[in-house]
């Protein structure tokens, strides 16, 4: 599943090129996870003002309303003036005066949803419970520790939940916990203030590095220009089960948490 870095990398790869474009046509393929919420014709004539990100959502600000785009499990966005005809897995095409924005989603867990504004009922349902942005100034170490204190579930699952901090995802949760020296099975409520500060710093560091590296391409992720990411080549623990830890040499262990694979070093990461 594309995580925060992949969504941010996608945004950066087309936001500047689509700003100011006039929407000329919209076509839909097979139904996605949620309906568009308006007639495609209603979007024609509107202008694209900007593209933002909230958690794992792309927010395309229009001259009237906005589009919320979620990439689901396997989705990707492309943008260009010479895209081929829509294929089997291309389910949303927005033709503009500056190029076509396309959502390709083989598994159709993604979505494109229209909302009147960021605070209406549709947008609130999707965005209302999202936690603080980890790369923003609002992500404060002390407040992060306070958010962890009442939670009795393992810290890895708290990070994936998106309410204490948004968008970290499976890959980067494993990597940040390794960097902070915290075992993923540790209850969030047991993490001390100093260790929470280490994790806070590690989350920011890992996500920043991932954006710089273009995200992670494990199967088929690419940005809106068709470029793959390379963070996975630098992973310390993710997808390295049985391989030696790059720090201490101990074998990396893999377990299942909440139906997701977790990777960690028994020696470097303490309960």
Swiss-Prot record:
What UniProt keywords are attached to this protein's entry?
DNA damage, DNA repair, DNA-binding, Glycosidase, Hydrolase, Lyase, Metal-binding, Multifunctional enzyme, Zinc, Zinc-finger
A GO molecular function assigned to this protein is:
8-oxo-7,8-dihydroguanine DNA N-glycosylase activity
Q: Which SUPFAM superfamilies match?
A: Glucocorticoid receptor-like (DNA-binding domain), N-terminal domain of MutM-like DNA repair proteins, S13-like H2TH domain
InterPro entries membership: DNA_glyclase/AP_lyase_DNA-bd, DNA_glyclase_Znf_dom_DNA_BS, Formamido-pyr_DNA_Glyclase, FPG_cat, MutM-like_N-ter, Ribosomal_uS13-like_H2TH, Znf_DNA_glyclase/AP_lyase, Znf_FPG/IleRS
From the UniProt record, list the reaction(s) this protein catalyses: Hydrolysis of DNA containing ring-opened 7-methylguanine residues, releasing 2,6-diamino-4-hydroxy-5-(N-methyl)formamidopyrimidine; 2'-deoxyribonucleotide-(2'-deoxyribose 5'-phosphate)-2'-deoxyribonucleotide-DNA = a 3'-end 2'-deoxyribonucleotide-(2,3-dehydro-2,3-deoxyribose 5'-phosphate)-DNA + a 5'-end 5'-phospho-2'-deoxyribonucleoside-DNA + H(+)
Please give the superkingdom of this protein's source.
Bacteria
Q: Under which EC number(s) is this enzyme classified?
A: 3.2.2.23, 4.2.99.18
* Active site (UniProt): 2-3, 56, 260
**SMART domains tied to this protein:** Fapy_DNA_glyco, H2TH
Query: Per UniProt, where does DNA bind?
Result: 89, 107, 151
Q: Give the UniProt record's GO annotations in the biological process aspect.
A: base-excision repair
Comment on bound cofactor:
Binds 1 zinc ion per subunit.
**UniProt key word Cell membrane:** no
Q: Cross-referenced HAMAP family, in alphabetical order? A: Fapy_DNA_glycosyl (MF_00103)
Q: What role does this protein play?
A: Involved in base excision repair of DNA damaged by oxidation or by mutagenic agents. Acts as a DNA glycosylase that recognizes and removes damaged bases. Has a preference for oxidized purines, such as 7,8-dihydro-8-oxoguanine (8-oxoG). Has AP (apurinic/apyrimidinic) lyase activity and introduces nicks in the DNA strand. Cleaves the DNA backbone by beta-delta elimination to generate a single-strand break at the site of the removed base with both 3'- and 5'-phosphates.
Q: Which NCBIfam families match?
A: fpg, PRK01103.1
Q: Which family is it part of?
A: Belongs to the FPG family.
* Name recorded for this polypeptide: Formamidopyrimidine-DNA glycosylase
- Which gene is the coding source of this polypeptide chain? mutM
């Amino acid at each position: 599943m594309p995580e925060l870095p992949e969504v941010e990398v996608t945004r950066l790869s087309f936001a500047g090129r689509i700003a100011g474009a006039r929407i000329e046509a919209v076509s839909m393929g097979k139904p996605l996870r949620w309906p568009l919420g308006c007639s495609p014709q209603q979007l024609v004539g509107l202008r694209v003002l900007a593209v933002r990100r909230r958690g794992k959502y792309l927010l395309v600000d229009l001259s009237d309303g906005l589009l919320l785009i979620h990439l689901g499990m396997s989705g990707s966005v492309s943008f260009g003036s010479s895209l081929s005809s829509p294929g089997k897995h291309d389910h949303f095409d927005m033709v503009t005066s500056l190029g076509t924005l396309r959502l390709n989603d083989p598994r159709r867990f993604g979505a494109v949803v229209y909302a009147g504004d960021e605070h209406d009922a549709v947008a609130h349902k999707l965005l209302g419970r999202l936690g603080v942005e980890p790369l923003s100034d609002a992500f404060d170490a002390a407040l992060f520790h306070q958010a962890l204190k009442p939670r009795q579930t393992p810290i890895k699952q708290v990070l994936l939940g998106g309410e204490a901090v948004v968008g970290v995802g499976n890959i980067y949760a494993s990597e940040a916990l390794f960097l902070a020296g915290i075992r993923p099975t540790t209850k969030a409520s047991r993490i001390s203030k100093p260790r929470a500060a280490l994790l806070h710093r590690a989350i920011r560091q890992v996500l920043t590095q991932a954006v710089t590296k273009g995200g992670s391409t494990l199967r088929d992720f690419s940005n809106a220009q068709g470029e793959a990411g390379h963070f996975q080549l630098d992973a310390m623990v993710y997808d390295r089960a049985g391989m030696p830890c790059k720090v201490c040499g101990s074998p990396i262990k893999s377990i299942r948490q909440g139906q997701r694979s977790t990777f960690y070093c028994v020696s470097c990461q303490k309960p």
